[in-house]
Amino acid sequence: MRFMVIVKASPESEKEGAVHDPQLLLEMGKYNEELIKAGVVLAMDGLHPSSKGVRVKFSGGSHTVVDGPFTEAKELIAGFWIWKVRNIDEAIEWVKRCPVDGDSEVEIRQIFEMEDFAPVLTEEQIQHKVAKRAELPNQTANK
């Protein structure tokens, strides 16, 4: 099973030019090495503050671009991992080991696999999507 592990932003992570704690960065590096060694990580990255981002809102066939920053830090994302683990319990156990600084929140969400769409897609459609996904860089077919 694949999961997206979402590190929620904080007021500190949303500050422009925020200086990260060197000790926390060292601990996070070691944690990431453990995840990689265990074969859990498929992708991972941290994100710049929302002040460097935009939102594109769609309504009635048109779109509007809204520049950051965005005010509700608790609704923003500071970083993420994509993990492949046996189940959500394994993901939870890994998250519990995550080094954090102060108050933090991490959300775990299961990623759809092709077989999840079996009730609405034909086998041919699923195979086509699996083949297209395999063409993406750093991707494996998920069927």
What are these regions (language model features)?
Residues M1-K143:
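Conserved, structured core segments of small domains
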